[in-house]
């Protein structure tokens, strides 16, 4: 009997010791929840860069990623974030504005890093913006120099008069970009008209209206536009209206040129931030929002040929 009792106690002690220090993955690995807004290439590249950088910093055997896509739905973002919190993940990557908003609403303790977010002040309703979110939130911004995006239009289409600004009205960061770019273009002598659509159901109709009224169209970094680039291309290319975009993925399908950052590099910066937070080298509450150092002029050779547009030196083919 004593031997049986001793054996039971030994098993219980072993189980207790095994449970010490475990994370949700059942090991001592860091568990990272990634909530990505949409399945398009810019966001995919940001997620990939993040995972590569964090894996390189911590070691492949030290980190596990839970990567989920919200399919463009806010409610799904909230559900994904709630699932991560229930699982007690070590850090959340919110890839795009809506996942960031959902994560900030859901937790003030679990570290949250945003990426592919254009303007944190707008996204988080912080009018007194200092570059620091504070608390348990920081991240990276994908905001390329908007004055340089306007300058691309001036360089390629100096004879144009009317610029259509096409964007999704439900994306606050798109409104921010369009407002800024409109100011730059107006100062350059262009007449700008906004063409805002609600969702994919009215995108084609709004795009047709933009084509009818515009010599050239500008599309900001807009996740909804990026998800439905084929819909846009099916309207603008037959209409013969060139599109300058805020990101490379939209340009690759529907545009002729862009001045864009590398979303992979953006993800790398975010992954390096995550590593410093998880290892205790940095305090997220004092970590300012970061960006990548450079943006690149790119063009779409296929669409330029279709529309008879000659691109000057200094532009790289979009991937």
Enumerate the predicted regions with their spans.
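Short beta-strand elements in bilobed, periplasmic/extracellular small-molecule ligand-binding domains
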Residues: 56-77, 136, 182-200
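Hydrophobic alpha-helical segments within soluble ligand-binding/sensing domains
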Residues: 27, 120-162, 261-282
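Pocket-lining segment of extracytoplasmic ligand-binding domains
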Residues: 172-241, 247
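An alpha-beta-alpha
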Residues: 32, 50, 138-185, 287-303
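Short, low-complexity disordered leader/linker segments with a strong preference
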Residues: 1-31, 56-60
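Beta-alpha junction/loop-to-helix N-cap segments that form part of ligand/metal-binding clefts
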Residues: 67-128, 222-246
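Hinge/cleft segment of the Venus flytrap/periplasmic-binding protein
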Residues: 276-319
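Extracytoplasmic "Venus flytrap"
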Residues: 31-51, 66-76, 222-227
């Amino acid at each position: 009997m004593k031997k049986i009792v001793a054996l039971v106690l030994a098993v219980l002690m072993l189980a207790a010791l095994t449970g010490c220090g475990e994370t949700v993955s059942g090991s001592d690995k860091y568990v990272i929840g990634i909530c990505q807004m949409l399945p398009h290439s810019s966001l995919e590249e940001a997620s990939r860069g993040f995972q590569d950088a964090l894996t390189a910093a911590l070691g492949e055997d030290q980190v596990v990623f839970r990567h989920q896509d919200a399919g463009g739905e806010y409610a799904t973002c909230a559900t994904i974030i709630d699932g991560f919190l229930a699982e007690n993940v070590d850090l959340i990557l919110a890839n795009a504005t809506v996942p960031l908003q959902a994560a900030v609403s859901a937790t003030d303790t679990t570290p949250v890093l945003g990426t592919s977010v254009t303007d944190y002040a707008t996204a988080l309703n912080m009018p007194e913006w200092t570059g620091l979110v504070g608390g348990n939130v920081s991240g990276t911004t994908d905001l390329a120099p908007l004055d340089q995006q306007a300058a691309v239009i001036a360089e390629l289409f100096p004879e144009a008069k009317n610029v259509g600004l096409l964007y999704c009205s439900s994306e606050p960061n798109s409104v921010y970009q369009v407002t800024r770019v409109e100011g730059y273009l107006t100062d350059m002598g262009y007449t700008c008209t906004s063409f805002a659509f609600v969702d994919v159901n009215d995108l084609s109709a709004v795009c047709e209206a933009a084509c009818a009224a515009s010599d050239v169209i500008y599309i900001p970094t807009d996740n909804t536009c990026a998800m439905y680039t084929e819909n846009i291309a099916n309207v603008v290319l037959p209409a013969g209206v060139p599109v300058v975009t805020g990101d490379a993925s939209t340009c690759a399908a529907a545009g002729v040129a862009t001045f864009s950052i590398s979303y992979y590099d953006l993800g790398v910066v975010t992954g390096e931030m995550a590593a410093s937070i998880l290892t205790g080298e940095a305090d997220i509450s004092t970590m300012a929002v970061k960006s990548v150092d450079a943006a690149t002029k790119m063009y779409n050779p296929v669409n330029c040929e279709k529309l008879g547009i000659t691109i000057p030196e200094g532009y790289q083919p979009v991937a």
